[in-house]
Amino acid sequence: MKKVVFFLLDFYRYGLSSFRQTLGMYGVCRYYPTCSQYCREAVQKHGIIHGLYLCLRRLMRCHPWGAAGWDPVPEKSNLGIKRTKKADHPLKKKVSLMRVMHLFFK
């Protein structure tokens, strides 16, 4: 399945993108690495599902009014998903009624 994704990315990169330039539509990518390189690297590092998700997020950021510059593929441990343990969640802590009453009626 990765080979199909890589084939489509290479087809765009070397076929369609080059054809656009011959028609005079010069679209220079705002980021480094380019979006097609980013997608290829994301699929290699994270697999098809997470890689295509990261690729879609990148394509949504790539517009004329967006940011530009260095935008590497995140490492596996940093996918933007932060999880908390149930015990550490602030709403899961048990507080006795006497303690709450003590705070209100000092």
UniProtKB/Swiss-Prot annotation:
Main localisation: membrane
UniProt key word Cell inner membrane: yes
Protein name: Putative membrane protein insertion efficiency factor
GO cellular component, one term: plasma membrane
Membrane topology summary: Peripheral membrane protein
Function: Could be involved in insertion of integral membrane proteins into the membrane.
Keywords annotated in UniProt: Cell inner membrane, Cell membrane, Membrane
Family: Belongs to the UPF0161 family.
Pfam families for this protein: YidD
Subcellular compartments: Cell inner membrane
